[in-house]
Amino acid sequence: MNKPKINVVKKIALPKRGDSLDNLAGYPTKFELPLMEDISGKYINTLYAVKDITVDWNAYKDHLAKVKPEFHPHVLFVGHDSSEIENITLMSLGGVLQHMNGKANYALLGHNNINTLNTIIKNKQPEWIGFNLYTGLTDFVFEWIKHYKIERASHILKKNIFDFDTADKALKDMVREAKGPIYEGDQVLYAPIIIGGHFNNYSFDESFVRGGDYVVRGKGINILRDILLGLFVPGIYHDPMPYANIPRMDREVFYKDMYEFSDKTKGYVFSK
């Protein structure tokens, strides 16, 4: 089932009741994983200590510009087109990108137009693809991921691959070795799949088996930051800590991408 292999720290120290959950330093200066524990072989708990989290996102942005001047991650966030409220999850995650000197694009899609994603990827050239999945609205997404992975694995390995499990394992192994996207020069050959959302509350294992390279259960602010930094290997991760360190939401680009295809307030990209 292509489960991840990871060294897990056994001694764990978490904030106690009444302890401050605010990182007074503003952000971590080292790029290292938090303490982690294996939950019965199901997923990895990422136990971020206060010192591990970013709370001053503007200062963190300036810090990254100094120590990683060439670092500009680009993520395409994909959600469902069935909701009439703002997708604050995607906008919050987009805020992480903004404060890492990166770029986010957005698409809200349904089962009738999921294949439009191929055109978006060709035009936008993201380094990562992040899905926010809801229960009951997943089969067409997993079908798209299946075809995407088979096509990309065949292209990269220069041979015809027809079996999804073979393609999935090959790409996960490549992502593990590269610690992120697969490139040929400046060209992105494969943008790893990150899957989050309510679907992962119970079906996290299905998300991984059906193509997610990185599956995030629970709040994804801290995990996304460290995935983009190349700290995590493919696997299933859960952040149980209740830190309120959400950055400023990326509303401007979210609505720009919405209105590129619709002049309605609802603004669902490709929802026609």
Where are these regions (language model features)?
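Acidic, low-complexity intrinsically disordered segments
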Residues: 3-272
